[in-house]
């Protein structure tokens, strides 16, 4: 049933998008993934919203979502003009020609990366991947968001590579809905095994006091994953798209405070960070991984 539900989610987000070549908009609608913290996120990016309004000379409305699927649907259905998408959500969205990749976050002009990890609670008898393989049938497994790279795609691909097909190898598989929910479910021993991101999830939850060091035990860490893509609706005018891109590329210099507030959702120190251009081809590795997983063939 959960496998069928996930396939239905993927089918839903791959619905057709608008076909206008030069969409006119009086208010720029920016989709933001806020996870489980919409109020805190809104406060942190308030300055960035004001910066965009000043640079673009138009009202800007931020739309907060608790999942990536809503962002993909929003831009595909012409309800959003700008979105920040996880690598996997970006790949899913590009199955329909609805967006233009603009920028990604960098440190010292170098694209930032992050990692996925598979974990259990600190006192668990599962200490490594061999233990996981041996006891999988006794364990419940939790992914984060269906359209998350680190919280779903990458760990799913890894588990399959070692002979563990999630739906068939584990006692039960669920989607928690977000990175914090995945980690807290395991911390509270409601789920045995979880999947999430290290730098952008676990470390932030530790800093915010949601989890203490040692309450989760890491079993596996992935290779580096390319970071999110900030994209524009392809139906916007070329002039507006270029203005949006320029505003993002210049924000760290023109309004450092607004920039720092925006990226503080993930990074505590923005002094060496900035946005740099990103390109579709940089996400080909994520595409290849997605296409290699039998359960995700519906993205084609």
Model-derived segments and their meaning:
Residues 13-16:
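C-terminal motif of bacterial Sec signal peptides marking the signal peptidase cleavage site
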Residues 69-83, 92, 96-97, 114, ...:
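Short helices/loops that flank or line small-molecule/ion binding pockets
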Residues 28, 36-47, 236-300:
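An extracytoplasmic/periplasmic, membrane-proximal ligand-sensing/linker region
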Residues 137-239:
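Pocket-lining segment of extracytoplasmic ligand-binding domains
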Residues 105-162:
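A conserved helix-loop-strand patch within extracytoplasmic ligand-binding domains
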Residues 18-20:
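Bacterial signal peptide processing site
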Residues 22-91:
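Extracytoplasmic small-molecule ligand-binding "clamshell" domains
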